[in-house]
Regions:
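Phosphate-ester processing/binding pockets and catalytic centers
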Residues: 1-274
Length: 274
């Protein structure tokens, strides 16, 4: 391909779950095993090949290290760290080394966050008044549209790897959501985009960039769910935009964190009464 063709590489994953109610219709958000927030993140990685090589090299060194031989997640049959880094499953010492490595990569991270209590209360009201059930995929697709609205017009070829959500194949729906994001940008700014958009659902073991965005989301999730900022702080400069859509203390569309408004634990505390 000609050298003047501009590429953008994006990697998409989620954190949290989309569980809202028990079998009797009671809201269970925040109970053990159920997250308070749901977030979707996009990592823009300048050089995916280098990232892949360095992550694979780190994994190979760790797999060969005697100290980690007996750790279950390092065993090939466990299908965890041995095939892909995953912040939730990785041994603490290994997680530290992954965090240290990914800080050096040329990465920009964009995240959209929903408070599940807010979603659940609206959903319950809609069901009572209209008989309308909550559509979980619609929540995910809406965040995809918000994230990609301003990310699709700066390259000739946009390659998007999206972490598979369970066994469900939703390529067509994701393509529609991303195409709508492109249309929303054009409608707002009156700028047309001729980018060629290539979308491919994948597993983190297949695409190293998905392991990167998983780590960034895990660090942010710990900040939101547990008010722990020790993982977030070293990575903070890489998060270019965090859209907290249900924190409407100051603006009706939510709180947007960026260089102009850096996210801190102090800002999150007291953000919601629920």
């Amino acid at each position: 391909m000609p050298e003047d063709i501009k590429f953008r590489h994006y990697f998409v994953d989620e954190a949290g779950d989309l569980s809202f109610f028990n079998k009797t219709g009671r809201i269970i958000v925040g109970q053990p095993g159920v997250s308070k927030f749901f977030m979707v993140g996009v990592a823009q990685i300048a050089d995916p090949e280098t990232v892949t090589g360095e992550l694979n090299a780190l994994r190979a060194r760790l797999m060969a290290h005697p100290r980690y031989k007996g750790i279950y997640s390092m065993q090939p049959e466990a299908k965890k760290t041995a095939i892909a880094f995953h912040a939730k499953d990785d041994y603490a010492e290994i997680r530290e080394q992954v965090f240290e490595l990914i800080q050096s990569f040329d990465i920009k991270v964009f995240v959209a966050i929903r408070s599940k209590v807010e979603i659940a209360e609206v959903a319950r009201a809609n069901f009572k008044s209209l008989g309308k059930k909550l559509q979980q995929n619609a929540i995910y697709d809406d965040l995809i549209k918000r994230l990609f609205r301003n990310l699709l017009h700066k390259a000739d070829v946009v390659q998007i790897a999206i972490a598979r959500r369970g066994k469900e194949a939703r390529e067509e729906a994701l393509e529609q959501a991303i195409n709508q994001a492109q249309k929303n940008f054009e409608a707002k700014w009156k700028i047309s985009s001729n980018s060629s958009i290539l979308i491919g659902p994948a597993y983190p073991s297949q695409v190293a960039g998905l392991q990167i965005v998983d780590y960034y989301l895990w660090a942010l999730q710990r900040l939101y769910e547990r008010e722990e900022d020790q993982f977030f702080k070293p990575l903070a400069q890489k998060y270019r935009l965090i859209m907290d859509l249900d924190d409407k203390r100051n603006k009706g569309y939510g709180e947007w964190y960026s260089d102009r408004n850096p996210l801190t634990l102090e800002k999150l505390r007291g953000a919601r009464s629920k």
